[in-house]
Amino acid sequence: MKLSNQKTGHLLHSLDVSYGSGSGQQAVIGSTSQDSAESMWVVRSEGCKQGDAIEKNQLIRLQHARTGKWLHSHLFQSPLSGQQEVSCFGSSEQSDTGDVWEIEWDDGKKAAWMQDMAIRLKHKDTGRYLSNHGKMYPRPIAGNSEVFASSAKGKEQLFKATEGVYYSVNK
């Protein structure tokens, strides 16, 4: 699936480029390109089978579909805003608690995560929220915006699942 930020409209995106500072891990950015496979993510959760609903406050991991690395955060500073860096790290065989996110939403009537529903992803280790703003990178990833983790809970922290492969919910 693809995740779009509610404020910027940019897609959560990663490509095989490493940060030049901080962790040096694979960069995660906000992309304006709507048709790239680099914006595809697979949702994983402990004990969750294909077709199981993702419930409010459930712990999930997002795996980058092309590289197999996990959406990750840690205490390194992000390159543009100095907030908390978000990267891609590990592999299907290598994961740690820095890859775990808690899914939240404000609509109390919804029991399960649905397409086009505004959600927040809270990093389990640090309590910060996946975020995107309009600050754009220079070369080599010019035209893409910074993705980071923040303690704020505004529009920069709201994402929605847009296109992707969705399954009927298991009964």
What does each model-identified segment do?
Residues 1-171:
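Lectin-like carbohydrate-binding module/patch detector with strong preference for beta-trefoil
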